[in-house]
């Protein structure tokens, strides 16, 4: 125990008390009292130990005096009505031709609302219901019997709420409620920022909503879905894959595959981007990465989807790499290496699976590529997949009887899934554009819904294809295929 540190803390506590900074003074007093208590436990000589206990008692008395000062100052902040009525005889004689002075409004402190740690923010409909019960901003008056709360009462209430929150978190699963993550040691703002990135515990995207990509669906079922159904089988060398990397051109359905994985498994789905894990403050980005994986293990089974992972974990050792970026990459690699929730002694149903997507696989760091054990190629849709995409995108639109989706699917060869969706959207708007051509705004507003619900024709698709070109070139496809031949692991 450093005796100089004890003396320094006691000196600072007294100085802050003299300067009127009572909060800081109480912190130093608490720290030095705890230090003396620990030091007394290590002292063997009874005489020396008695002197230290006497010093501790004196500091406790000073600490209580500071607390009483704080309590007195807080009691001054509470408005109290006068103890005796104002006599009418003291008022000056009023002139009837002059307006009397306004009556001063009575200021009352708002009632203190106790909130538990597990309280979640209400939805919009809940907020509307609260507003319907009574006028907003009208607080109930405080009765005279209520006593002003002191700092000691606040500490006791806060301590009681923390204990209750921990107990509720442990019993949350048995009550059927979703337990709340206890982020002890982390900033509350960081936890709330990551909780906002929990897209949903059920994103409602199913395999049938994704056309084609049968090989990718099969691998993702094997990596995520089957370990949930057969936990006894996926043990030892058969443990589930720790990470899956989806490689392919933009707009081929990588994000929808990740959401379908979370839906089919019923897992908590974290949608993470580079902006989520970066901060301008030194060391906070590494904290965010570590906190993300701790929350994922708490809410397990979990799917962490990192979109555009090349922007977070690009190749290390380059000349233009910043030192802060290197620390974030190192923390991400460390957390991913220890994220295997289905190792020999762990429950596969409590696993955390990292699902990543990128359009630039050649920029990814080698160590990250090793941790993402499965690397699959998400190609452009085939002829069958293009026809299925047309049916999915046009299922809410009326089609002309003469239109053949198979013929249109042949014409859009080389288009990605996003390109096909844009073509369908543009073609479905062609009839509306023809109908409102030359009309004034008043005439457009007067149109009925039936006049705009016109079937989509083959000519509409031909016009849309003239306006929208494919976004992926043949050179890009060759580059992806070459990388998969060298580093693929399907």
Curated annotation (Swiss-Prot):
Residues annotated with N-acetylmethionine modification: 1
Segments of skewed composition (Low complexity): 128-139
Keyword line: Acetylation, ATP-binding, Cytoplasm, Cytoskeleton, Isomerase, Microtubule, Nucleotide-binding, Phosphoprotein
SMART domains: AAA
Residues the record lists as Phosphoserine modifications: 174
GO process terms (BP): microtubule severing; spermatogenesis
CDD domains membership: Kp60-NTD (cd21748), RecA-like_KTNA1 (cd19522)
Enzyme nomenclature, EC number: 5.6.1.1
Region (Disordered): 87-182
Record localization: Cytoplasm, Cytoskeleton; Cytoplasm; Cytoplasm, Cytoskeleton, Spindle pole; Cytoplasm, Cytoskeleton, Spindle
Catalytic activity: n ATP + n H2O + a microtubule = n ADP + n phosphate + (n+1) alpha/beta tubulin heterodimers
InterPro entries recorded: AAA+_ATPase (IPR003593), AAA_lid_3 (IPR041569), ATPase_AAA_core (IPR003959), ATPase_AAA_CS (IPR003960), KATNA1 (IPR028596), KATNA1_MIT (IPR048611), Katnal1_chordates (IPR028594), KTNA1_AAA_dom (IPR048612)
Annotated ATP binding sites: 248-255
GO molecular function annotations of the record: ATP binding; ATP hydrolysis activity; microtubule binding; microtubule severing ATPase activity
GO CC term (a single one): spindle pole
Basic and acidic residues bias locations: 116-127, 143-169
Keyword DNA-binding part of the UniProt annotation: no
Chief subcellular location: cytoplasm
Top-rank taxon, per record: Eukaryota
Family of this protein: Belongs to the AAA ATPase family. Katanin p60 subunit A1 subfamily. A-like 1 sub-subfamily.
Oligomeric and partner information: Interacts with KATNB1 and KATNBL1.
Record's function text: Regulates microtubule dynamics in Sertoli cells, a process that is essential for spermiogenesis and male fertility. Severs microtubules in an ATP-dependent manner, promoting rapid reorganization of cellular microtubule arrays. Has microtubule-severing activity in vitro.
UniProt-recorded name of the protein: Katanin p60 ATPase-containing subunit A-like 1
């Amino acid at each position: 125990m450093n005796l100089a540190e004890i003396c320094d803390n006691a000196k600072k506590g007294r100085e802050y008390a003299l300067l009127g900074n009572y909060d800081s003074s109480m912190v130093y007093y608490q720290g030095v009292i705890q230090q003396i208590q620990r030091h007394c436990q290590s002292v063997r000589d009874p005489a020396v130990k008695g002197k230290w206990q006497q010093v501790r008692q004196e500091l406790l008395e000073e600490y209580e005096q500071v607390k009483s000062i704080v309590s007195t100052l807080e009691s001054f902040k509470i408005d109290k009505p006068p103890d005796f009525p104002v006599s009418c005889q003291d008022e000056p004689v009023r002139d009837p031709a002059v307006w009397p002075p306004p009556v001063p409004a009575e200021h009352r402190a708002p009632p203190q609302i106790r909130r538990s740690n597990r309280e979640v923010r209400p939805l919009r409909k809940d907020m509307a219901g609260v507003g319907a019960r009574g006028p907003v901003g009208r607080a109930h008056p405080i009765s005279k019997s209520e006593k002003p709360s002191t700092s000691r009462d606040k500490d006791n209430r806060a301590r009681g709420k923390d204990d209750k929150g921990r107990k509720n978190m442990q019993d949350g699963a048995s009550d059927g409620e979703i337990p709340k993550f206890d982020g002890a040691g982390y900033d509350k703002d960081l936890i709330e920022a990551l909780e906002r990135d929990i897209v949903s515990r059920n994103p409602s995207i199913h395999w049938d909503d994704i056309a084609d990509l049968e090989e990718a669906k099969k691998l993702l079922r094997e990596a995520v879905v089957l370990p949930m159904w057969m936990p006894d089988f996926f043990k030892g060398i058969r443990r589930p894959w720790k990470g899956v990397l989806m490689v392919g051109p933009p707009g081929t359905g990588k994000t929808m595959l990740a959401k379908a994985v979370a839906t089919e498994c019923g897992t908590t789905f974290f949608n993470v981007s580079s902006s989520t894990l970066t901060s301008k403050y030194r060391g906070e980005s590494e904290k965010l990465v570590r906190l993300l994986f701790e929350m994922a293990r708490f809410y397990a089974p979990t799917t962490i989807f990192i979109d555009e992972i090349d922007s977070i974990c690009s190749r290390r050792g380059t000349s233009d790499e910043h030192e802060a970026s290197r620390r974030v990459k190192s923390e991400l690699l460390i957390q991913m290496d220890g994220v295997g929730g289905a190792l020999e002694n762990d429950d596969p149903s409590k696993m955390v699976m990292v699902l990543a997507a990128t359009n630039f696989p050649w920029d990814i760091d080698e160590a990250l590529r090793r941790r993402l054990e499965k690397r699959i190629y998400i190609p452009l849709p085939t002829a069958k997949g293009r026809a299925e995409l047309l049916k999915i995108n046009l299922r809410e639109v009326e089609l002309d009887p003469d239109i053949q989706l198979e013929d249109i699917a042949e014409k859009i060869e080389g288009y990605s899934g996003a390109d096909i969706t844009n073509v369908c959207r543009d073609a479905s708007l062609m009839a509306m554009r023809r109908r409102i051509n030359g009309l004034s705004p008043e005439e457009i507003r007067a149109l009925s819904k039936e006049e705009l619900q016109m079937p989509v024709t083959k000519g509409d698709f031909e016009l849309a294809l003239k306006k929208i070109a494919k976004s992926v070139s043949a050179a890009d496809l060759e580059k992806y295929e070459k990388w998969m031949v060298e580093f693929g692991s399907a």
